[in-house]
Amino acid sequence: MSHGAVSQSLTIATAYDTLGEEGLKHSLMQTEAKAIFCDPGLLGTLQNPLKEVKEVKFVLYNNVGEYKQEHVDKLKEINPDLTIMNFEELRDLGEKNSVDPVPPDPDDVCCIMYTSGSTGTPKGVSLKHKAVLASIAGVTTIIGKYIGPGDRLLTYLPQAHILEFVFENACLFWGGTMGYGNPKTLSDASVRNCKGDIREFRPTILVGVPQVWESVKKGIIGKVNAGSPIVRNMFWGALKAKSTLMSTGLPGSGILDAVVFKKIRDATGGQLRVCMNGGGPIAKDTQRFISLAITPMISGYGLTETTAMGALMDPLHWTDSALGDIPSSIEIKLVDFPDAGYYATNKPPQGEVWIRGTPVTEGYFKNEKETAESITSDGWFKTGDIGEFDDNGHLKLIDRKKNLVKTLNGEYIALEKLESVYRSAPITANICVYAQSDKTKPIAIIVPAEPALKKLAAENKVEGASIEELVHNKKLNSAVLKELQSAGKAGGLQGIEIIEGVVMSADEWTPANVSFFPSTM
């Protein structure tokens, strides 16, 4: 759909369904959109926004999943002039009424991507065609030599996500093959009577966000721990041995891959050569685990405002202590942040990450105030992330300005870093770490992983028929707190970063039932 729009020099705008009805209404009104394309399951979400947004004349939906006729009827009732059709009907219409391409210019706006704003109102990040091309070039200069026409990329992240947008276009540039999956059907455990998306498609490249990789890791550990003592000892012994071999450069890891880790690799299709984490920080332990048990996991860093450019790891320069090289299409500098003691003159150099280059947005759509606050007159975008450079010139993120909270003892803690560590605990399905200036330590609000919670309840002789009942049990709450505190200590957190309390929620977090989101969700 986006390529069809580009062929006619049309600008697209993307918005997450998690922005809610108000966010959707804002993006439609601000862009004065004439058409909207969505999943059929979201047709009902359009009803209230379209009562006020009268510029929309076309509602298009894809053919993946069933739609409810009542939603279509309601939309027609709201606006009788609406044209509503599915993707196949649209394609058939195009085949019968072909038009010549109208290629865009590099300075034309390709996409307006809406992200959560600091005031609650979504911000539209305006990205030109030259920004997208420069981003693909930046990715290619680092990992292009490892990827070619024979590679397969499994795509399943929202297409409103800048990481997905860039990598899909990059895959086409490399001549690779894309397979579209769904986060809910990735693994065999998520489906019945068929293979999961990963094993069916057998990708060679898999890009994911921290929450996906934590789920993969926990799934592997769960299966290993469910095996016999011999299986458990063999797995953990092999993992330790491979770590030693890899760190010393000694041969022999291939034998362990063929004998011990083969079943795990087969569960991911058996063809994976590169895993990549993006969209947020991942626990070192998880990155190392995936790299040893499956295939090397590289890291990437970027923002919507920089068209996903920031840092990207070269697979042959693997490390779990930094994000990687600076892409060729941007430049980065570290700017002093005195409040927390970060200075470019520190050893190593530290400060707020500022990025400049062709991939960087020239401003937020119809939002001069946010643009002036975020972008300097000479084109530097202020990311709000605190970084440092290592001896190899690789970028490492150590904090985030907005997530730095000064506690009662006067010291700063970084909430995003804490969330990445505590998320690695088997008990955690989702998490938000909270701190305030009149308390000495943070607390955590979590959605527990149901199997792990029930297992912990049984170990502590806590009775409860449902997760709704278990999350309110005080004895179990104490046990969960100990699990999280142990994970924090194992992850290298300092004393002031160890949570002193936990609140459990039985419900999955959605825009409809909560008024906050964790920073790395």
Map each language-model feature to its residues.
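Conserved C-terminal "lid"/linker of ANL adenylate-forming enzymes
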Residues: 430-432, 481-521
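Conserved pre-ATP/AMP-binding loop-to-beta segment of ANL
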Residues: 83-85, 91-114, 121, 146-152
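A short helix-loop-beta submotif of the ANL/AMP-binding
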Residues: 1-13, 17-21, 29-35, 151-152, ...
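Structural core segment of the AMP-binding/adenylate-forming
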Residues: 7-89, 481-485
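Conserved AMP-binding/adenylation subdomain of ANL enzymes
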Residues: 133-152, 159-258, 271
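Conserved ATP-binding/catalytic segment of the ANL
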Residues: 340-347, 352-407
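Conserved AMP-binding A3 loop
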Residues: 110-136
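Adenylate-forming
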Residues: 359-361, 394-423, 452-474, 495, ...
